């Protein structure tokens, strides 16, 4: 009943564009004083499964380091770990997610005490996952019934527990870094938190 018919718009055609170009996902190391490139590594090359917002790109997350290793998160394209000289140590594909309104995947990874935290809140396919920072092996993963959020989590030690505090749709939640148990949550945010 509501399907478009060509005769309704004889001079126009409509469609949805999907990325069809191979993108190169690059990690750069620059000299802080001069801006000179020290090294450049291609993490992966692929055609993204979805587009990105015009003001954004597929490299939205900030790289994270523990002083020994560099962690680069390109969302559905993968998570890549390098030593500080550019040698790839490991990589993980954490799966593709459908992104809200083509805004991309922009939550940066956080590292604490040998654990790497990745939050992915997109279109109710949402998760929070903790990996071993040295090996990339999973420690725990929790599904989250969330819409879209793009806020990087915060690690806080309180009441004898190390907590991962992160936004959610309409609320803030705290998870136990050791095992992923929900410690507390409170309302007060809107959806699509950044």
Please provide the spans of the model-predicted regions.
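Noncatalytic, solvent-exposed loop/strand surfaces
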Residues: 1-194
């Amino acid at each position: 009943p509501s399907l478009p018919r060509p005769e309704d718009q004889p001079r126009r055609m409509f469609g949805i564009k999907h990325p069809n170009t191979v993108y190169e996902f690059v990690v750069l190391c620059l000299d802080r004083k001069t801006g000179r490139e020290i090294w450049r590594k291609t993490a992966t090359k692929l055609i993204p499964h979805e587009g990105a917002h015009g003001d954004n790109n597929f490299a939205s997350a900030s790289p994270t380091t523990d002083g020994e290793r560099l962690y680069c998160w390109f969302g559905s394209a993968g998570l890549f770990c390098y030593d500080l000289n550019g040698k790839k140590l490991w990589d993980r594909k954490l799966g593709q997610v459908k992104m809200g309104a083509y805004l991309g995947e922009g939550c940066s990874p956080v590292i604490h005490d040998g654990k790497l935290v990745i939050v992915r809140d997109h279109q109710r396919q949402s998760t929070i996952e903790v990996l071993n920072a040295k090996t990339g092996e999973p420690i725990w993963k929790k599904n989250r019934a969330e819409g879209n959020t793009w806020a990087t989590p915060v690690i806080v030690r309180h009441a004898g527990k190390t907590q991962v505090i992160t936004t959610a749709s309409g609320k803030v939640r705290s998870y136990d870094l050791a095992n992923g148990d929900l410690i507390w949550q409170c309302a007060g945010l809107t959806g699509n938190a950044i």
